[in-house]
């Protein structure tokens, strides 16, 4: 373990990844999304329908907290020009047949476009349109039932048979910071550990060397470093940005422990496929976005196809993010996140066995190669000795 710790602190690239990235990235993400919400975001509306239905929809959108209808355009090109000039952060498009399709009792469509410079813009325009759409569905159904001669009481029972109201106990103002930063914190831990371990392995392969310490000792070195980083990310940073911290400390520490050892086993397994230390930075851009979407934070797990749900089980962050959301935001206890803990422990067992087998194979390969090299050098030395002895014999014979 001590040898691996010395290697970690002797490699400047690994120190940058582990310490600088692990400590600064959570703070940077928190500062970017500190407010968590954007109110009255300017949008442009392109109403090609010019119907009473589209005008009513636009009025309701403008009344929401999330967006402000700053411009009404006659064409999509005009709306795109406004977005390029950064005068608006989104566009809502009503097609020409919007009112006609509703009149024919057919499904109508509304298109939304958001400036993806920030997820907040996408969230705002999507939430505003979805809330108004749900309200419009009630209005359309009420109008259609009234045209059939139904009474107000019967219409109310048909439109809303079970009265319901929106109640969001753990994120009342739909703050983006609460659910995004919670996921980002765990991704920082997983990704920086994987990239740091991959850089170390890439350096060893480029030098045609192998690890001389035991796998358990090396794993303990990384776990020791990252327990501190994980406690900083999951305990200090949420308090720094005044995020909800409803969970009990022992439950959070247990989740941190299982997540860290799972990340160590995951990193030791997949870092074997990294041959050069520079290639790992290319994987950073791909893996981070993929893990975020597969965690269930932005893309609901219930809506994932079976294939992508299976892919999400590859990464420790999937189970850890779900468990951290439940503990930190909803005050869940360890028995309540039993499926996530089982997932982390199962991953740890699988990746540990895989890492041991790959390490055993690599050591055998290295020892075999070293043995062959020694035999080759021995034969070469023996050949030189025999040649020297032959030369000496010839020299003695010529005297």
Language model region names:
Residues 23, 27-28, 124, 192-196, ...:
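Transmembrane alpha-helix boundary/anchor motif
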Residues 178-295:
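Transmembrane alpha-helical segments that form the functional core of multipass membrane systems
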């Amino acid at each position: 373990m001590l040898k691996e710790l010395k290697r970690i602190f002797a490699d400047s690239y690994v120190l940058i990844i582990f310490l600088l990235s692990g400590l600064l990235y959570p703070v940077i993400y928190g500062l970017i999304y500190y407010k968590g919400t954007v109110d009255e975001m300017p949008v442009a509306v392109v109403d090609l329908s010019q119907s009473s239905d589209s005008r009513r929809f636009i009025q309701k959108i403008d009344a929401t907290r999330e967006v402000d209808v700053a411009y009404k355009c006659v064409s999509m090109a005009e709306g795109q020009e406004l977005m390029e000039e950064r005068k608006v952060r989104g566009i809502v498009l009503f097609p020409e047949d919007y009112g006609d399709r509703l009149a024919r009792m057919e499904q109508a469509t509304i298109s939304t476009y958001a400036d993806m410079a920030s997820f907040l813009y996408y969230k705002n325009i999507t939430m505003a349109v979805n809330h108004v759409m749900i309200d419009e569905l009630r209005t359309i159904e009420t109008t259609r039932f009234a045209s059939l001669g139904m009474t107000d009481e019967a219409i109310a029972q048909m439109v809303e048979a079970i009265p319901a109201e929106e109640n969001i106990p753990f994120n009342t103002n739909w703050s983006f910071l609460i659910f995004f930063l919670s996921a980002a914190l765990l991704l920082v831990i997983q990704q920086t550990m994987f990239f740091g371990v991959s850089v170390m392995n890439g350096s060893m392969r480029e030098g045609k060397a192998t690890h001389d310490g035991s796998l358990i000792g090396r794993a303990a070195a990384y776990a020791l470093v990252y327990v501190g980083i994980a406690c900083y990310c999951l305990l200090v940073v949420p308090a720094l940005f005044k995020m909800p911290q409803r969970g009990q400390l022992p439950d959070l520490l247990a989740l941190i422990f299982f997540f860290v050892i799972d990340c160590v086993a995951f990193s030791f397994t997949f870092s074997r496929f990294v041959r050069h230390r520079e290639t790992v930075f290319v994987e950073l851009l791909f893996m981070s976005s993929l893990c975020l979407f597969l965690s269930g934070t932005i893309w609901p797990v219930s809506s994932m196809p079976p294939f992508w749900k299976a892919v999400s089980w590859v990464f420790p962050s999937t189970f850890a993010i779900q468990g951290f959301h439940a503990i930190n935001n909803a005050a869940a206890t360890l028995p309540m996140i039993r499926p996530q803990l089982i997932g982390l422990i199962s991953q740890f067992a699988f990746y540990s066995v895989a890492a041991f087998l790959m390490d055993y194979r690599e050591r055998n390969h290295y020892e075999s190669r070293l043995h062959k090299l020694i035999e080759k050098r021995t034969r070469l030395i023996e050949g030189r000795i025999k040649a020297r002895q032959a030369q000496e014999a010839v020299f003695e014979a010529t005297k």
